[in-house]
């Protein structure tokens, strides 16, 4: 049973990231971590506002921000392997208990994933979970996540990105969105 766990980039700002990674290390695998872009993606937003470059360039830079977060996570937990090719995650995750996905621009382009701020690492995690035929997707956020909230409600509150429902609508896997505190209290 492969589980994709998306760790929001804001976990770095709240200092919860190391604890979340440690909790994942104690969980039974196989697990694939999808990193949010965190402060690296925020710098892309700031730069786009200043320099007015297009959304395609911004989207690609945000994917690079996710790659930077993958490197950061690997530095904190060297026993977690980084894997770039999404196609190899399904089989590789059975050899290595925890993998960190470092998304590749070309692979996302080949999958016809549109460039824009409405598609963030939330939607990319949903896409990846479907692509590798995961059994579960867990999205861990710093924000408060109301119990029983629908995806649409979470999108309207800005907790999930605007495209998430599109990517998750045909999911053949369980999806859970939770706050970091709930994740840590149930997974460490």
Task: Please state what every model-predicted region is.
Residues 1-185:
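Nucleotide/pyrophosphate-binding catalytic subdomain
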Residues 188:
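Phosphate/diphosphate-binding glycine-rich loops and adjacent basic-rich segments that engage nucleotide
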